[in-house]
Amino acid sequence: MDEKYTAKNRDKTFVVIEKRFKKNIIHRFSAKRSLFLFTPRNPIRRLAVCIATNVCFDYFLMFTIMINCVFLAMPDISEFAEYIFLGIYTMEMAIKLVAGGFFIDKYTYLRDAWNCLDFTVIMISYITLLLQTINDKVISDITGLRTFRVLRALRTLSIIPGLKTMVNALLRALRMLISVLILILFCLWIFSQAGVQLFGGALRHKCVLQIHGSPAFGKTYDEFYAEHIENSDNWLAKGNGEYVLCGNATGAGPCPTNYTCLPDIGENPNYGYTNFDSIGWSMLISFQLLTQDYWEDVYNKVIRAHSPWTVIYFIVINFFGSLYLMNLMLAVVATAYELEVKNTGKKLQQTAATAREQSLKEQERRNTLTVSEADSHVDDRNCTCCEQCCGCCYNPWLRVQSFAHCIITDSFTEVFIIFIIVLNTVFLAMEHHGMSMELKNVLKVANYVFTTVFVLEAILKLLAFNKQYFKSGWNICDLVVVVASLIDLGVEGLKGVSVFRSFRLLRVFHLAQSWTTMRLLLCIILNTLGSLGYLTIILIIVIYIFAVTGLQLFHTEYTPDKFRGEPVPRWNFNDFLHSFMMVFRILCGEWIEPMYDCMRACNGLCFLIFIPVTVFGKTLFFLFIGLVLGAFGSDTVEQEVEVSSFALPGPESKPCSVRERGISATDDNVKDDGQDEVQQNSEETKIDLRNNDKQSKDGMILENNCNNDSLASLGSLGSIPDIMDGSSVEDDISSCQQKDIQPCLPLFISSRFKCLREFDDTSHGKKWNNFRRQLMMVCENKYFETGVLVIIFASSILLAFEDIYLNEKPRLKLAIFYLDITFCLLFFLEMVLKLVALGFVHYYTHFWTILDFTIVIITVISLAASGLGMEQITAFRSLRTLRALRPLRAVSRWQGMKIIVNALMLSIPSIFNVLLVCVVFWLIFAIMGVQLFAGKFYKCVNETNMRIPPTEVANKIECYNKNYTWVNSNVNFDNVGGAFLALFQVATFEGWMEIMADAVDVTEVDEQPKFEATVYYYFYFVLFIIFGSFFVLNLVIGVIIDKFSFLKKKYDGTYLDMFLTPTQQNYYNTLKKLGTKKPQKTVKRPKNKCQAVVYDLVMSNQFEIFITTIIITNMIFMAFEHYNQSEVVTEVLATANIAFTILYAVEAIIKIIGLRIHYLRNLWNVFDFLVVTLSVMDAFLNDIFGDGIFMNPSLLRVARMFRIGRIIRLIKWAKGMRKLLFALVISLPALFNIGALLMLVMFIYTIIGMSSFGQIKLSGALNDQVNFQTFGKTFLLLVRLATSAGWNDILGPLLIQPPNCDPNYITTSTGEKIKVVNGDCGMPWLAISYMVSYIIIVFMIVFNMYIAVILENFNQAHAQEEVGITEDDLDMFYGVWEQYDPLATQFIKHEQLSDFIQDLDPPLKVKKPNNVAIATFDLPIVKGGHIHCLDILLALVKFALGGNLEETEAFKRVRTQMEARFDEIFPTREKSEIRTSTLQMRREEMAARTLQRAWKRRKIMRSFPSPEMIRYFIISAPETAV
C-alpha cells in the first residue's frame, strides 16, 4: 500500500510492480473501492489487477487488435466476427474497471486518455448494434457510426511499448503549431477574399460560336440567343472534352475566328469545382495553391480567363504561402517535437544523431587491426577444436589460410574488386529493350564472369577469416548476394523467378566498402530507420485508419453511373489496396484531383477524408522529414569519420593490413599500441565535407583538396581566419586595391626577356604603370561600375525582344542589330580597360573576369555570324543562345547577390558528392525498372491516341493488322537513361500517376496492356518514393540548406559567431536585435478637455476591443459576397460596406483628434489610414462607376481588395503571429538577394527557352497561351515551372519528332513557310537537359536557399525566445523608458536608474535593493550625470543571460563589429563625453563613506578620552548602510 499525496488530498493508492524486459514497471491504482464494491484485497479485484498488469494480457490484446485490423480492411465484415471482437474489448474494459475503478478517483479507468478512447469506441459499437437491432432499415444510416470502429487501430499506440510515450510527446509538441495554423488560416482567408474579389466568375468565360441565321417562327431573338449560348455544342472544346476558357481583358486568351468570348456560360472547370465564385470554393482553391497540388491548372486557367498580370497573385501565394508558411510549419513541428522529447527526459533525442555516431565509432573500433595483430591472432579465426580434429592437416590448413589472407587483403585485390564492381554496374546498366542477340550473349557471359569473381572472393574470405567472416555485416550482405546470384543462374531459364536477378543490383553496395561517403550514407539510413521506427509505425497506423475509413464510407460509391459514362477512376476506395494507395498519394501531396473524383461520387463527404489527411498527414510527414533532415544534416554529413581500411592504403599502410571488409576484430584482439596506431592514422585521414574546397580570394573554387583544415578539428579559438573582418567578400576589382599594381604579364613570359624584366624601371615603363594606375582608378570608380551595370541591364533587356516574331518586324530587327553592335563595342572597351588595368595574370585567373571575357567573345562571334548571314548554322545558333548568359555579368557587381552566388558555388562540391551517391541509389531502382518494365509500356492506340481494349487487340501483330498504331509512352523504362528520367518525375511527383498507371497495366513485351494486370507493381514505386525521394532526395536538400547557411554566414560577415560559446551566441543574437529599436517620444495627454476625452477613449482597451469586433464583423459580412448573388444580398452588403467604412473613417478621425501629429508615428495607424482612404475611394468609385462604363471593372475589383487589408490589423494584437512574421521580416534582405538571383536565373532560362523552343510546333500542353514564343509567355511558364508544377507536361511536346512535325520548315503567323534548321521539331537532348537542369537549379537549389534563410531566422528567433530575451521584452523596455525620457533624448539621470530597472518586467527587471547590481554593470556616465539607454540595455541583457561571457578572441571581434554598428545607429551615444561610470561612482562613494567613518572615529576618540566610553559609543552607534 502507498499513501501518495496524503498531505494534500489524502488519495490512498497501491502499486503493483511487474518485471518486464528486465525492468521494473510500476502500475498505480486507487486504494478505494472500485465500482463502490471491490476493495484492494478483494479476490475478484486482485485477479483483475493480476490480469491487467500481466504482459501476456497485453500480447493477447495486441494480437486481437492486429486480427481486428485485418477484418476491418475487408469491405464486408462478418457480423459474427464483430461480436467476438466487441466481446473481447468489453472483457478488457470490465477487467480494467474492476481493477482500477471507473472515473471518480485518480488512477481510475477514465482518468487515462487511452482508456477514454477505448470506452468511446466500445460505446459507439454498442449504440450501432442497438440501432441495428431496433430497425434493420437504418443500417445504411449508421455507416458513419460503424466507421468509428477503425479507431481501434489506435489502441496499438497504447499497447506497443514506447509508442505511448512517443504519442504523448507528439501531442504536447503540436501545441506549438497553434500559432502557425492560425497564421495559415489567416493568410488563407486573405488569399480567398482576394480571389473572390479578383476572379469571381472569371472561369465561366467560354468561346461561343457566333450566331448565324434567324430565330424560328414564334420565338423572339432573345429566346433564340439564350438557347444558342446555352447549347454546349456551340462552345469551343479541346480534344479532351474540356471547354476552352477565354477573356476580354488585354493579354487574356482570345477566341478563334467565328467565336465570341461570353461570360457566365455553363459551369466552372473541373466539373464545377474550380472557381473563385464564393468564399468556400475560393478557400479550397487557395488551399490547393498553398499545398502546390496541381496548381498549374488553376494558374493557366486564371491567366487565360483574366490577364497575365494575375501572375502577381500566384507569386505571392507561392513565395509567402507555400515557401514560407508550409516550411515554417515544418520547422515548428520538428523544433516542438525536439523540445518535448528533451522535456520528457527520454533517450529519443539521441536516436537521430548519437546512435549514428556511436554505431560508426563502435564499428570502426571493432573492425580495424594492424598487421602485427592480425598475424599474432591468426589462429583465433579458427575454432578451438579444429587443431584437435584436423591433426597433421592443421598446419597446412593454416598456411592455406595465411596465403588466402594475404591475397584477399592485398591492395591490388581491393582495387581489382572495386574495378569489377564498377564494371558489373556498367554491364547491368547496358541492358535495354531491343538489345541485339550479340549484346545479350555478352551480358550473359559477363554475368557468369562477375558471379564467378564474387564467388571466388567469398570463398577466399571464408578461407582467410573463417568464423570472423560472419562478424561483419558487409560480408554477410556479400554472401547473400552471391547465393542469390547462384540461384539466379540455376533458374535462369524459368519464368516468374526474375526476383533473384534483382539481387544482382545489390552488388552496387560493394562500393560502400571503399567509398566513404556512400558507406556513411548507408549507415545513416539504417540508423535513421531504427530511430524513426516508432514514428514510422504511427505513420502506418494513420494511413491505415484513413484508408479503412475511406473504404468503409466510399467503397460502394465509385460506380460508373456517377461518372457520366466514364470508367471508374483508377484511384478509388473500392478495396483496401486502392484505399491505402489513395491515402499514400494524398500524403505525397496529390489530393485535389482524386477529391474531385470523390466529390463526383459522394459530394461533400469527401472533405472528411481528404482535408484531414492532407492536414494531419502533412503534420506527420513534416515531422518525419524534419527528423530525417536532422539525421542527414551537417552534423552527420560533416562527421569526422575515420576512413576505414576499405579505402586504398596510404603511404604508411602495410600491404597485408586487415580490412574491415575482410575481418571483424573483437576488442580483445586490439592492443594498446595498435589502438595508438589506429588513432594516429585516423587523425591523418579525417574527412570533412564542409571544408574541402581550396578557394581563391574572390571566393570561387579553384580545386578540391581534402585536408585537415576542418572547422570541427579546431582545438581552440586562438587562430581565427582573417578572411572576415565584418565586411563581405571582396570583388575582383577591390581585391586589387594595393599600392602596387598587378604584373601585366605572367612570370614565365616576363622572366625570359631582359627588356620585359627591366621595363618597369625605364621611363616608358613608369609612364605605362602610371597609365595603368589611372585606368585602375577609372575601373574602381563607382560611377564606372554603375554605368557598366546599366549597360548590362539594357543589353539584357534587348534580348527579350528577339522572339519568333522578330523576322516579321524588320525595323525592330535592324535597330536591335545596331544596338547589339553598340553594346558589344562598349563591353569590348570595358574588357580592354580592365585587361590593361588588372594585367593578364589577374584578369585570366578570376572567375568573374573570365566570365566577362567569355560573354564578350560570344557576343562578338555571334554578331560577326549575323553580319555574314551565317546565323542559321547550328554552331552559331548555339553561340547566339549563349548570349543569354550576359546578365550573369551583373552578379559580380551586385555585392548582395555575389555573396549568395559565392556561397552557392562553394556548396557545389559537397552537393555533387552527395548527389553522386544518390545517383548510385537511383541506379539500383533504374536497373530494376528496366528489368521489370523494359519494352512493356508499348500500347495499341487509335487515331485519337486512346488505348484499345485488350479484348479487341491482344498484341502488336493484331494492332498492325487492324490498322491501329503501336506506340510507346514518352517516358518509359526501355533503358537506364529513360528510367532515370521516369524516376526523376516520380521523385518530383510530376507525371508519376501516368508512369504508375503504365507500370501496373503491363503484361509482356509486345502484348497489349491490361487494366491493373500487375497491381503489385505499385509497391515498387512506394519503395522508391520512400527511399529514393523521402530519404535520398531530402539528404541532398539538407546538404544544400546546411552548406548554403554555413557559407552565407562566412561571406556576409557573420562567420565569427560559429566560434562562440552558446552563451556568447545568445548574447550576440540579442545584440543584433537591439539596433532595430530606439526610444520614442511619449504622447502626452492633451490639455484641451475635448481632446483629452478623445485621447482617453482611443487609448482605452475597450476601444481596441470594439474596433477588433468591428473588423471581425466586417470580415464575416465580406464572406457572404459571391458571384451571381441576388440583388437583396448585394444591397445589404453594399450598405454594410458603407457602414463599416464610416466606422473606420470615424475611428481615424477621432484618433487624429486625440493623438494629433503623433497619429502618424505608429505604422499601424498609417496602414489604417491608407486602408480607410482606399475604402472611401472604393465606395465612391463603386457608386459612380458601378456599371463599369467609364472604368474597367477589374480596377474596381482591385480597389475592393484593399478592404481585405482591414483584417491585417488583427496581427498587431496577435503575439504569436507577430513573432512568426518577424522571422520573415528579418529575412527580407537575404530573401531579396535570393529573389534577385532567382529572377536572374529565370531570365537566362527564358532567353534560352525562347531561342531554343520558340519555333516548336504547339501540341499537348503547349498552346497559344503556354509556349516559348515570346518573352512574356516564356517567363510566365517558367514561373510555374519554378515549383516543378507540370514540367513533365511541358517536356512531352518539346520532344516532338517527325512525322508529328516538319523537320525542315516553320510556319509563321502569316502562314508563310520558312526553312530553318530542325524545322518545328524538338531536340530531345536539349529539351531534357534544359528542363531537368532548370528544375534542379531553381526548385531544388534556389528555393531551398530561400527556405534555409527563413528556417535559420526562425530557429534563431525561437532559440532567442528560449533564452528569455524577445522582441516583446525590448518593446517593454522602451515602453517603460518613455516614462523616464518623454522627449526621447536616449538618456536618463543616474539617480533614476534604480527606479527604472525596478519598474521593468522580467527577465530584465532588477529588484531593489539594486545598488550593487548597478555598480557591477559599470555603466558609462556622460556629462550631466546621464546614462544612455543602449548601455543600460546591454548591461541588463548580459545580466539576464547569466553574465558569464568568456572573453575569447572571436567574442571580442564580434563585439567590436556590433559596437561599430551601434555607433552608426546611435550617433549621440558616440559623441557623448564619458566622465565616469557607475562602478567608479560606487567606489568613490565607498571611499567617501570610509573617510567619513574614519573622521567620525577620530572625533570620538578626541571627545572621549576613556577607552570604555569609546568602545561603548562605537558599538551602540548605528552603522551607515553600505
Curated annotation (Swiss-Prot):
The keyword ATP-binding does not apply. One of its GO terms (biological process) is membrane depolarization during action potential. Glycans are attached at residues 248, 258, 942, 963, 1124. Gene3D superfamilies: 1.10.287.70, EF-hand, Voltage-gated potassium channels. Chain C. The chain crosses the membrane at residues 51-70, 78-99, 113-134, 144-167, 180-201, 309-331, 407-426, 443-464, 473-491, 499-522, 532-553, 608-628, 778-797, 816-837, 847-868, 875-898, 916-937, 1010-1022, 1101-1120, 1133-1154, 1163-1184, 1195-1218, 1237-1258, 1324-1346. Pfam families: Ion_trans. Residues 71-77, 135-143, 202-278, 304-308, 427-442, 492-498, 554-575, 597-607, 798-815, 869-874, 938-976, 999-1009, 1121-1132, 1185-1194, 1259-1270, 1294-1323 are extracellular. II repeats lie at residues 393-647. The sequence contains 4 internal repeats, each with 5 hydrophobic segments (S1, S2, S3, S5, S6) and one positively charged segment (S4). Segments S4 are probably the voltage-sensors and are characterized by a series of positively charged amino acids at every third position. Mediates the voltage-dependent sodium ion permeability of excitable membranes. Assuming opened or closed conformations in response to the voltage difference across the membrane, the protein forms a sodium-selective channel through which Na(+) ions may pass in accordance with their electrochemical gradient. This is Sodium channel protein 1 brain. It comes from Heterololigo bleekeri (Spear squid).
